[in-house]
């Protein structure tokens, strides 16, 4: 897709998601013709509102694409043994091709132990350490985490040159920062990972052709923190002093300086 960026162009994720869905529908159709009906198992403990909202979104997306789903509802007080037993059963079920464990878990469950139980071949959310390691090695046979993958897909969709680009990733979590850095490195970008202890942070970010903000601090990136004409991907979801949702980037002060920015 050819995009001529004007100053401060807002780039959105929906066209990217729609294109990915279109491609997936074709892939699922081909699998069905071969006698394979892709199925996702969603494992949920209790009935937290955020889990239910995420689950509804996943079910809707799967329905659109043509992927079968099964919701495995577990009691809030489930034991470690019973949770792991449920996962092993899904691992062995040949009719289930993907497993999504909704998190965070209740306190009685040991997340570190659970992530070694899920089958890496069915771990669609990059929960397994094996899939995390594959990202570090540049091995594309595993499942990368969704949000870092979305960052790369958005940049590609809008024809942002990654090969040789100077990229600053603000945040070092295993949820976004580290995997996003590795995925961008695999695209031959030159990546600098920034965090709370980075010296001269503003100097580092203001030299980046592409800035990925994923630190979880409301509007911390201001005009002086970005390079003229840079591309900014704001992953942060925060609440500002007025109680409004906002990102890590102060969009109002940055938009006129950059070439493209996510809302």
Where are these regions (language model features)?
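Rossmann-fold NAD(P)-binding glycine/threonine-rich loop
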Residues: 112-132, 236-263
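Glycine-rich phosphate/diphosphate-binding loop of Rossmann-like nucleotide-binding domains
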Residues: 45-59, 139-231, 240, 246-255
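Short beta-strand elements in bilobed, periplasmic/extracellular small-molecule ligand-binding domains
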Residues: 62-77, 191-193
